[in-house]
């Protein structure tokens, strides 16, 4: 058994890479046979040019008092529509959003449109209770009622526990 340690001796020959080459496979990497084919016919434009009119005209002022303009950018539930739906530039959307918020604060606009929201809830409930049975679908009003009852129960239980603790301390 060899137990003594010998110091590491540096070899005098410089390190050289092995002469063996990496054995590459003979077949090159195959590209899929479906390549993008260039269409021989150019893209056909429609005969009548269609240009979407901008929602905000050049003379329209984006202001909280301009209710006819602001109402175009609010949904039926009273929510601010997204930029994709509005087709506005970022700057225009920002100005519209600020104008809507300002109009809401100054009570020119309601924060929510409750009449249309009730109709929307009725439609969603009729969709849920349609002919096709759906699993694990809760009607929001029922879960809200259940949660409020549970919260009330927890509140009463906490009151009882506090009263017991107070009476035991005396």
From Swiss-Prot:
InterPro entries according to UniProt: Ribosomal_bS18, Ribosomal_bS18_CS, Ribosomal_bS18_sf
Subcellular location: Plastid, Chloroplast
Residue ranges crossing the lipid bilayer per the database entry: none
Coiled-coil segments on the chain, per record: none
Chain residue ranges for the region called Disordered: 1-61
Molecular function per GO: small ribosomal subunit rRNA binding; structural constituent of ribosome
Main location: plastid
Residue ranges, compositional bias (Polar residues): 13-26
Domain of life: Eukaryota
Name the UniProt record assigns to this protein: Small ribosomal subunit protein bS18c
Biological-process GO terms, alphabetical: translation
Family of the protein in this entry: Belongs to the bacterial ribosomal protein bS18 family.
Organism classification: Eukaryota, Viridiplantae, Streptophyta, Embryophyta, Tracheophyta
Quaternary assembly: Part of the 30S ribosomal subunit.
Keywords from the UniProt entry: Chloroplast, Plastid, Ribonucleoprotein, Ribosomal protein, RNA-binding, rRNA-binding
Pfam families in the cross-refs: Ribosomal_S18
Gene: rps18
GO CC annotation: chloroplast; mitochondrial small ribosomal subunit
Extent of Basic residues compositional bias: 27-55
């Amino acid at each position: 058994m060899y137990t003594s340690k010998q110091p590491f001796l540096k070899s005098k020959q410089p390190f050289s890479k092995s002469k063996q080459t990496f054995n590459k496979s003979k077949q090159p990497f195959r590209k899929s046979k479906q390549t993008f084919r260039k269409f021989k016919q150019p893209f056909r434009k429609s005969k009548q040019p269609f240009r979407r009119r901008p929602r905000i005209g050049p003379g329209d002022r984006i202001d909280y008092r301009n209710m006819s303009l602001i109402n175009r950018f609010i949904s039926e539930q009273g929510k601010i529509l997204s930029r994709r739906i509005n087709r506005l530039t970022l700057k225009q959307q920002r100005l519209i959003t600020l104008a809507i918020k300002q109009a809401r604060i100054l009570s020119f606009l309601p924060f929510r449109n409750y009449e249309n929201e009730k109709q929307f809830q009725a439609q969603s409930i009729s969709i849920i209770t349609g002919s096709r049975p759906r699993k694990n679908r809760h009607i929001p009003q029922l879960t809200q009622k259940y949660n409020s009852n549970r919260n009330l129960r927890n509140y009463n239980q906490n009151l009882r526990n506090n009263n017991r603790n107070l009476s035991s301390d005396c």
